[in-house]
Swiss-Prot record:
Cofactors, names only: Zn(2+)
Protein name: Threonine--tRNA ligase
Gene for this chain: thrS
Catalytic activity as recorded in UniProt: tRNA(Thr) + L-threonine + ATP = L-threonyl-tRNA(Thr) + AMP + diphosphate + H(+)
Residue sites binding Zn(2+) per the record: C337, H388, H514
GO process annotations (BP): threonyl-tRNA aminoacylation
InterPro entries linked to this entry: aa-tRNA-synt_IIb, aa-tRNA-synth_II, aa-tRNA-synth_II/BPL/LPL, Anticodon-bd, Anticodon-bd_dom_sf, Beta-grasp_dom_sf, TGS, TGS-like
Ranges for region Catalytic: 246-537
Chain's role: Catalyzes the attachment of threonine to tRNA(Thr) in a two-step reaction: L-threonine is first activated by ATP to form Thr-AMP and then transferred to the acceptor end of tRNA(Thr). Also edits incorrectly charged L-seryl-tRNA(Thr).
EC number(s) reported in the record: 6.1.1.3
Chief localization: cytoplasm
Amino acid sequence: MIHITLPDGSQREYPGPVTVAEVAASIGTGLAKAALAGKVGTGDDAKVVDTSFVINKDMPLSIVTAKDADGLDVIRHSTAHLLAYAVKDLFPDAQVTIGPVIENGFYYDFSYKRPFTPEDLVAIEKRMAELAAKDEPVVRRVLPRDEAVAYFKGIGENYKAEIIASIPSNEDVSLYREGSFEDLCRGPHVPSTGKLKFFKLMKVAGAYWRGDHRNEMLQRVYGTAWASKDDLQQYLHMLEEAEKRDHRKLGRELDLFHIDEHSPGTVFWHPKGWSLWQEVEQYMRRVYRDNGYQEVKGPQILDKTLWEKTGHWDKYRENMFTTESEKRDYALKPMNCPGHILIFKQGIKSYRDLPLRYGEFGQCHRNEPTGGLHGIMRVRGFTQDDGHVFCTEDQIQPEVLAFTTLLQKVYADFGFSDIIYKVATRPEARIGSDESWDKAEAALINSLEASGCEYVISPGDGAFYGPKIEYTLKDAIGRQWQCGTIQVDFSMPERLDAEYVGEDGDRHRPVMLHRAIVGSLERFIGILIEQHAGAMPTWLAPVQAAVLNITDAQADYVREVAQKLQKAFPNQGLRVATDLRNEKITYKIREHSLQKLPYILVAGDKEKAAGAVAVRARGNKDLGVMSVDAFIELVAKDIAAKA
């Protein structure tokens, strides 16, 4: 007898070996129809299998449907194969290579004699729908490696043969067939093509075979697939919104920054963009000051001997920019932590000095591949709001609790209230005692519970030197951005010999907490631009108000108004632009509206005589005529409320 344990804990008994599909059918016809795959085993041993998978011993089983994350992966993987099937059907000379699942979709790489056109994509997608409607069964078979190589060579699929030839000769490989198309794949796949209904092909791009620029350039067709029509439409709508909000596009239109071919992966900030940067940095500087952090500044270039001690020279060197001077090797720092330990080590530290908090706007460089660069979101040169707390094990929990509370306040001020909390726990390979890990993990979890946060645990995803919390924010269109982190580190203080004198008079190693709230300022500003679609809140806006005259007769008055606004705010003044051009007022209003300014002030003869201005708020909202003092009061409230 075979005993199957279901997710609710109930058991079902079968007289002999049974397939996943048969188990689903025995539970109910609805589940049998919805079944896409099965998940057998538990924990690290759990795996997703085809519905044709035969269960021949007692084991746990859950039926995977389109409602499950695993089900969505199976749908996307199978849709990638459906894409390849359609391409081979329409373009028999095309050769197939690889087609994995990626975030929100899939791609498949093809070798073909000419580039695919937009019209080709339309035809391929139409053919995919036709093949799906035929509801052809997807059938798995297993071949010895050499036999599989011969099979694919025999049908002219040389790329597939090359992939299989790289597999050890004593291994079998699995193939999946749907209709006339058969592909190499580990699986699992949907039981039939009729399960694939909601998909769309997105674009074609170039990709080198095996990622090597010396190899042939292939055509990579990207697509997306979802469990329902609503999910697909929602995703496509989100993409439309994301395109409108693209920080690269808005950066050009709003004259904030540009990326230049003379320095790929680094940002040229224009005056307006640098104003935005300064607002973010000065805000975060106040956060440092108000929460017990001492701001420090370390050098950007450090000798390789330091990076050898930290382990970066061996494990991270290819991502570091290196240079040589007077027969010594140096590297531009990819992170700030070693420098902060060197500062900590200057002078004797006592337990009374702990927790000791350092903060730095540290400029770092990482040699990211050119293909991975993306506007100001993924760069080679970036500045972090990088902080490090040196403390005892007993101080971890209160420090993390205070940090989480602070992070929530900062994110709310920038317009983000939806935060996802993830605790990454100990991996198999790690340093430090189990007792220290127990204490550190409990401190992270207890701190989140004390702050009322719901969290998920990601087992084994911690670094080898300590557990961490990752803070991921959701933006206005539902995208997730992992920005904040707090990481416990038992290793680096040991590697760099950091010590403090304890209450017992002996020397002890401090625990090091790496923490960042916004992370890379460049990336965070890119997120802000997209979150607000370029229409920055008044307190952040590079230009907070523009004052416009109707005729030359009001030019001097406009200058007076601008001067008064600038003087009204003692720290740095309101950021005001004047527009005295001899253009129609409607033209000037429209031009400044396109720059997404919070306020446009218009002065004609009546306003000049009354010592007032006509105020338009963003979104073409007419607030009427008011005194300059009344407008100052209005803006002051906006800024105070971070509106």
